[in-house]
Design a protein with these regions (language model features):
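The conserved Walker
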Residues: 1
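Conserved glycine(s) of the Walker
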Residues: 4
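NTP-dependent small-molecule kinase module
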Residues: 7, 11, 15, 84, ...
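Hydrophobic/aromatic beta-strand patches that form the interior of the parallel beta-sheet core
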Residues: 21, 87-89, 130-132
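ATP-dependent small-molecule kinase phosphotransfer cores
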Residues: 22-82
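Structural motif corresponding to alpha-helix initiation and N-cap regions
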Residues: 52, 76-77, 114-118, 140
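Short glycine-rich anion-binding loops that position phosphate/pyrophosphate groups of nucleotides
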Residues: 70-74, 94-96, 137
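A glycine- and Lys/Arg-enriched "phosphate-lid" helix/loop adjacent to the NTP-binding pocket
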Residues: 85-123
Length: 153
């Protein structure tokens, strides 16, 4: 939440001429609710299961897509396995920056953000082919970094 992954993924999809898949949007279309509403009504675990389900749906498409997925999906061992066959970019920033940015969005309250980041960082580091820290990068610099890595031999 707040790393800029959706913006970066949308622009990357445009640059690569690939379909863009936003897990938050998919969840809204499927349920009529956003993540905060689902977490409040059904619990955080139900939301995380749904986030993993929509990522599996995106990864199962016949056409390669650029996906903006919730960070919680990395907790699912099946997702980590599926990511082994993809090019995975972990988009992150310092916790303070993430908190400031996500406070402006429609996400659920970020209780335990630091603990989640500490738990998920090694999982993302293992799964990611590229890590982009957007805290000190402009959107265009972040995009250039990803495109350069993808196009490198």
């Amino acid at each position: 939440m707040g790393s800029g992954k959706t913006t970066l993924a949308r622009e990357l999809a445009r640059a690569l001429r690939r379909p863009f898949f936003d897990s938050d949007q998919s969840i809204r279309e499927r349920t009529g609710r956003n993540g905060r509403e689902i977490a409040e009504a059904e619990g955080v675990e139900a939301l995380h299961r749904l986030e993993a389900d929509v990522l599996h749906e995106a990864l199962g498409r016949s056409t390669p897509v650029v996906v903006a997925a919730a960070a919680s999906v990395i907790d699912d061992p099946a997702v980590r396995g599926a990511l082994e066959d993809t090019y995975c970019v972990w988009v992150t920033a310092d916790p303070e920056i993430l908190a400031e940015r996500s406070a402006r969005g429609d996400h659920r309250r970020a209780v335990g953000r630091t603990e989640h980041l500490e738990h998920r960082t090694p999982l993302f580091e293992q799964a990611a082919d590229l890590v982009v820290d957007t805290g000190n990068l402009s959107e265009s610099d972040s995009m250039e970094r990803v495109l350069a890595a993808i196009r490198a031999p």
